[in-house]
Amino acid sequence: MKLTLQLQLLPDDTQADALRSIVERFNEAATWLARVAFAHQCANKVGLQKLAYYELRARFGLPADTAIRCIAQVMEAYKRDKTFAPALRPQAAVPFSMRKNLGFKGPDWVSIQTLTGRVVVPYLMGTYQAQRFGFAHGKTDMV
């Protein structure tokens, strides 16, 4: 069973800029990558990774795990409808792996990978979320 918990990040201005930049860069990279997948008619995650991983990292400066997440997200979108190259909104949700580029540091801090390194951001959660927080694992989307 999937469990969804919503938390409110409380970044300062510098952290907010870093978080905004990774969201925008991720979505820009995903839109570019979708065009590559469409042009090569590549609907295979491993095939697309072989085709574009190094250029994706060099062109957009994404951390390694973020580039892999970008490839996976593009494949999910492209496989739904192969008749066009999907385009992501600049502020669309970005998936983060709780093992690689996101980690909770105590009851009220989260460490998040950005383009310039990690930022440690305070967050708030409600009673419902706090009661179920120990069960959370897997993937996180930043909206």
Question: Where are these predicted regions, by residue range?
Answer:
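Nucleic-acid substrate recognition interfaces
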Residues: 1-143
